[in-house]
Amino acid sequence: MSLALAVDGGNAKTDLALVAEDGSALALVRGPGSSPHEHGLEGALDRIEALLEQALAESGAGDACEIAIAELLLAGVDFPGEVATAKVRAEARGWARRVEVGNDTFAVLRAGTDRGWGIAVVCGAGINCLGLAPDGRQARFPALGPITGDWGGGHDVGLAAVIAAARSEDGRGPHTTLERSVPAHFGLRTPLELAEAVHTGAIDQRRVVELAPLVLAEAPADAVAAGIVARLASEIVALVRVALDRLGPVDEPVEVVLGGGLLQARDPGLLAAIDAGLSELALSLATIVVDLPPVVGAALLALDALGAPATAYARLRSELGAAAAQRNLEPLEVHHG
């Protein structure tokens, strides 16, 4: 029976699954991040290879088994040149007879729909979007962060909360409950104490991503937090609008798959704001919040490449989804670059 390797790699974490053509999940492992931008391409592949060895041992398949397809979906692999280089280097590892490389937004889209096309917006630590037409045409975004005009995701939401808290404290901005809750998250009393801790290195500024759930929680009762959430919803709607414009007219309803930690938290206020914005686009859109980690989408794409039987897809969703839940694999974060 043909085997498939599925990888969803981000800056913070990597999930790797080994599955059979009939959809059975043979192994699921998690390890450190494997973004080429963070670790170099060979360093990223080294990390994936270590996880593959672990998965082979866990599955009992052994080193002698033959993997037909490796589906590697990696954060930060956005440009055609990056994809081509990563594909050549991965092929040289000899993991599988065939290797496919792409950005991790493809994993989220495939995990959320069996149609093979639609729009995916991923909102984890950063934000990204993919549009895929029925005929295969793509609408992509570089998603390199501020340098490509991006705003959104846990980092930007958290940083906005820190800024709002500081301006509330010194009077330059409106009062907000974030003035107390933001420093309290780090065990501090005031935004100024937090600023000093970040300035001196006592607190890593990257930890602002931890504040995103706090902003969502306070938005119903705090106008400033609500404004941050409204901005996030507006950015998501803008990505969908542009993707739709690039893809052109479609004769049937378009599924918009929402993934990543911030969106999969299913915050009612955020989802309502997104739905309201999408309704103004005057198109037939169906919103889907994906419940599965992106590695499941990578595995489904691998089954597509194998020409797996229809029964394999339900089995894979069930078995790999259950394995992910058992190991408490939350949706992976999507990072800029």
Positions of predicted regions on the chain:
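Phosphate-binding/catalytic loop of phosphoryl-transfer enzymes
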Residues: V77-H175, R180, A324-G337
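Solvent-exposed beta-strand sheet faces enriched in polar/charged residues
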Residues: L73, G102, E255-G259
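N-terminal loops that bind phosphate or other acidic moieties
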Residues: L73-V77, C123, A217, G227
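ATP-binding/phosphotransfer module of carbohydrate and carboxylate kinases, centering on a glycine-rich
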Residues: M1-D63, I67, A111-W117, I163-G337
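Flexible, active-site-adjacent loop/turn segments at secondary-structure boundaries
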Residues: A75, A139, G145-P146, L192, ...
